[in-house]
Amino acid sequence: MSPITDALVPMVVEQTSRGERSYDIYSRLLKERVIFLTGQVEDHMANLVVAQLLFLESENPDKDIFLYINSPGGSVTAGMSIYDTMQFIKPNVSTVCMGQACSMGAFLLAGGAKGKRYCLPNSRVMIHQPLGGFQGQASDIQIHAKEILTIKHRLNSLLAKHTGQPLEVVEGDTDRDNFMSADQAVEYGLVDSVLTQRD
């Protein structure tokens, strides 16, 4: 975070037997097993999310983790490091879309534990194929084009697995930007239900 946004992060003060203890709000929520994935998915942010997932697993491998997502998407490799960690660790990772989950954000949303993937009522979800750009020698461009097609197939296969949609349907639906409401995301299988209020 930048110094400006650091100054805007609220602090929570708690009374303990040893006196007062202050936390920034995100650290306090981490104690409740809540992780925020907000903004562009990039390497630094992905490393922080992965570290939090691993930490919470070490604290209690049998208790669910809640991953709140508000992201326009970003780097495929950074996102895949989060996804692979979500699948690897023992606790179930419940995903919640607030605001938007687009591109890699939508992929991570769908990658949550089955039956524990949610959207808030006014959130938006968008799936599409991976973006890529490369310049250089023709042979290098050809190598990168082949790699992006491999990544596209891998992402579509995993999306088909998590949504229950046939691969051919996912391939067609991700060909262009495909926006969905919370209810449409449930219908498609990206999430399991829309949360309107706590039980």
UniProtKB/Swiss-Prot annotation:
Matching Gene3D superfamilies: 2-enoyl-CoA Hydratase, Chain A, domain 1
Keyword terms: Cytoplasm, Hydrolase, Protease, Serine protease
GO biological process: protein quality control for misfolded or incompletely synthesized proteins
Subcellular location: Cytoplasm
Main subcellular location: cytoplasm
Database matches in Pfam families: CLP_protease
Keyword Hydrolase tagged: yes
GO MF annotation list: ATP-dependent peptidase activity; ATPase binding; serine-type endopeptidase activity
Top-rank lineage group of the source organism: Bacteria
Residues of the active site: 103, 128
One GO term describing the cellular component: cytoplasm
Organism from which the protein derives: Photobacterium profundum (strain SS9)
Protein name, entry field: ATP-dependent Clp protease proteolytic subunit
Annotated EC: 3.4.21.92
Record text on subunit structure and interactions: Fourteen ClpP subunits assemble into 2 heptameric rings which stack back to back to give a disk-like structure with a central cavity, resembling the structure of eukaryotic proteasomes.
Catalysed reaction equations from the record: Hydrolysis of proteins to small peptides in the presence of ATP and magnesium. alpha-casein is the usual test substrate. In the absence of ATP, only oligopeptides shorter than five residues are hydrolyzed (such as succinyl-Leu-Tyr-|-NHMec, and Leu-Tyr-Leu-|-Tyr-Trp, in which cleavage of the -Tyr-|-Leu- and -Tyr-|-Trp bonds also occurs)
SUPFAM superfamilies: ClpP/crotonase (SSF52096)
Protein family (similarity comment): Belongs to the peptidase S14 family.
Function according to Swiss-Prot or TrEMBL: Cleaves peptides in various proteins in a process that requires ATP hydrolysis. Has a chymotrypsin-like activity. Plays a major role in the degradation of misfolded proteins.
